[in-house]
Curated annotation (Swiss-Prot):
Assembly mode: Heterotrimeric transcription factor composed of three components, NF-YA, NF-YB and NF-YC. NF-YB and NF-YC must interact and dimerize for NF-YA association and DNA binding.
Matching SUPFAM superfamilies: Histone-fold (SSF47113)
Tissue expression pattern: Expressed in flowers and siliques.
One matching Pfam family: Histone
Upper classification of the organism: Eukaryota, Viridiplantae, Streptophyta, Embryophyta, Tracheophyta
Protein name: Nuclear transcription factor Y subunit C-6
Keyword line: Activator, DNA-binding, Nucleus, Transcription, Transcription regulation
Gene3D superfamilies: Histone, subunit A
Cellular compartments annotated: Nucleus
Stretch list, region Disordered: 1-29, 180-202
Role this protein plays: Stimulates the transcription of various genes by recognizing and binding to a CCAAT motif in promoters.
Length: 202
């Protein structure tokens, strides 16, 4: 019996040892570039090191409390946000630097950040926040400039329908067919039947 306990103790020690991260755990696009891959492997190995931080916790807590729904913030939450923000900044900077190197420049520019955001599905949530680089629109005739919905001076750029990668188009339709769901009660279908059919044509 004592021998079994010894084996269990050995197994527990082995289970507590972190395995190096596999490539499947890395963020998208990180495995294609050696610099990004090495950065994320290093971050995953040192993810428990929250003592050294660059961003002020008081400022992060103030931003969190700006939301009217947030009443209290635990002491650990700003620390985790600080680490996440640092990782976000470094990753986006690396991706932007790669864009600067592609253009044979040694200075990081706003256009490099815009290009890094536009070329990464990870950062597509920033497309409305980061101004688009005007040179992208002139270099790629597929881009269509649309006025900003808020009336701002910076236009948004979109590819015409059928050009954007994603769900394939079927036939001449705009979207792939979706599954038909039964109608819910009170959605107006009963009214159409009472009026003699589909509600519009005879």
């Amino acid at each position: 019996m004592a021998e079994n306990n010894n084996n269990n103790g050995d197994n527990m020690n082995n289970d507590n040892h972190q395995q190096p991260p596999s490539y499947s755990q890395l963020p998208p696009m990180a495995s294609s570039n050696p610099q990004l891959r090495n950065y994320w492997i290093e971050q995953m190995e040192t993810v428990s090191d929250f003592k050294n931080r660059q961003l002020p916790l008081a400022r992060i807590k103030k931003i969190m409390k700006a939301d009217p729904d947030v009443h209290m913030v635990s002491a650990e939450a700003p620390i985790i946000f600080a680490k996440a923000c640092e990782m976000f900044i470094v990753d986006l900077t690396m991706r932007s630097w790669l864009k600067a190197e592609e253009n044979k420049r040694h200075t990081l520019q706003k256009s490099d950040i815009s290009n890094a955001v536009a070329s990464s599905f990870t950062y597509d949530f920033l497309l409305d926040v980061v101004p688009k680089d005007e040179s992208i629109a002139t270099a790629d005739p597929g881009f269509v400039a649309m006025p900003h919905p808020d009336g701002g001076g910076v236009p948004q750029y979109y590819y015409p329908p059928g050009v954007v990668m994603g769900t394939p188009m079927v036939g001449s339709g705009m979207y792939a067919p979706s599954q038909a769901w039964p109608a819910a009660a009170g959605d107006g279908e009963d009214d159409a039947e009472d009026n003699g059919g589909n509600g519009g044509g005879n």
